From Swiss-Prot:
Pfam families: 7tm_4 (PF13853). It is a multi-pass membrane protein. This is Olfactory receptor 5T3. PROSITE patterns: G_PROTEIN_RECEP_F1_2. GO terms for cellular component: plasma membrane. One of its GO terms (biological process) is G protein-coupled receptor signaling pathway. GO terms for molecular function: G protein-coupled receptor activity; odorant binding; olfactory receptor activity. It comes from Homo sapiens (Human). Residues 1-55, 106-129, 191-226, 289-301 are extracellular. Keywords: Cell membrane, Disulfide bond, G-protein coupled receptor, Glycoprotein, Membrane, Olfaction, Receptor, Sensory transduction, Transducer, Transmembrane, Transmembrane helix. The chain crosses the membrane at residues 56-76, 85-105, 130-150, 170-190, 227-247, 268-288, 302-322. Its main location: membrane.
């Protein structure tokens, strides 16, 4: 009986020893998960602690934001209300204006609050949501600008068949595909970025949650994330810019065949406006993302990010409408109705 009891105790001791080994082995996997949940919020430090400068920046960016909303949403209303603007070219322009309004709204309100608030924190989920929307709208705009370039080519190459060539069966899928591409691209980066461990500093040297500064503060190996960022952003930039350039080349060939000076001027104006918008937008994206996240530290980088998230959405209505006679006529007509 004693020997049986002793054997039973030895068996229990062996089981306990093996369970302890298994538990210590699982700790290897538990610790990274624990580290990931240590940071529950981030601090958006911005680029200045000077209160007087922050007040000035608040007033400046608040004014820019108001102009952005008025310009872009006003253009959307204009396209909806004016029957002369009911064609694919202006539908694309209204979608771009809506995107710019959303793009700016994702970033600007939180930034304005942080200029005057002592607590500049943003929750983990809030940061992920802001980044998801920001990348979605940004990527969608890249593809939409490419679709608009193709639309301009169709309009200039054969204007008589434009309404047939660019029917709802064509332009609606182009717009939808742009949004789908934006959502997929954003989802990939959100999953990759927020699967990392953030167990050290929670201070993001930025005015909003963006990928490079987040990767810079992660305590995980971010090599894969940086490759994803480089290859995905690089591929999207190459594809969309090529579509724009090829479309513009065909537009120029079509312009050279035109006999009407008025037609040439209108075509040059349309193509020139679009190239200006594309160059400014894609140029700032390339500067911001096509380099290692470790080099992301200077105020210059923050200013570039602010430019393409806040300033460009304000400029787009001016770029695409300033030399557009149809839009000018529609604006004058609406102002007459308002002040009649």
């Amino acid at each position: 009986m004693d020997s049986t009891f002793t054997g039973y105790n030895l068996y229990n001791l062996q089981v306990k020893t093996e369970m302890d080994k298994l538990s210590s082995g699982l700790d290897i996997y538990r610790n990274p998960l624990k580290n990931k949940t240590e940071v529950t919020m981030f601090i958006l430090t911005g680029f200045t602690d000077d209160f007087e400068l922050q007040v000035f920046l608040f007033l400046l960016f608040f004014a820019i934001y108001l102009f952005t909303l008025i310009g872009n949403l006003g253009l959307v209303v204009l396209v909806i209300e004016d029957s002369w603007l009911h064609n694919p070219m202006y539908y694309f322009l209204s979608v771009l204006s809506f995107l710019d309004a959303c793009y700016s709204t994702v970033v600007t309100p939180k930034m304005l609050v942080n200029f005057l608030a002592k607590n500049k924190s943003i929750s983990f989920i809030g940061c992920a949501t802001q980044m998801l929307l920001f990348v979605t709208f940004g990527t969608t705009e890249c593809f939409l600008l490419a679709a608009m370039a193709y639309d301009h080519y169709v309009a200039i190459y054969n204007p008589l068949l434009y309404s047939v060539s660019m029917s709802p069966r064509v332009y609606v899928p182009l717009i939808t595909a742009s949004y789908v591409a934006g959502i997929l691209h954003a989802t990939i980066h959100i999953v990759a970025t927020f699967s990392l461990s953030f167990c050290g500093s929670n201070e993001i040297r930025h005015v909003f949650c963006d990928m490079p500064p987040l990767l810079a503060i992660s305590c995980s190996d971010t090599h894969t994330n940086q490759l994803l960022l480089f290859y995905f952003v690089g591929s999207i930039e190459i594809v969309t810019i090529l579509i724009v350039l090829i479309s513009c080349d065909f537009i120029l060939l079509s312009i050279l065949k035109m006999h009407s000076a008025k037609g040439r001027q209108k075509a040059f104006s349309t193509c020139g406006s679009h190239l200006t918008g594309v160059t400014i937008y894609h140029g700032t994206i390339l500067v911001s993302y096509m380099r290692p996240s470790s080099s992301y530290a200077s105020d210059h980088d923050i200013i570039v990010s602010i430019f393409y998230t806040i300033v460009i959405p304000k400029l787009n209505p001016i770029i695409y409408s300033l030399r557009n006679k149809e839009v000018k006529k529609a604006v004058k007509k609406m102002l007459k109705l308002v002040y009649k």
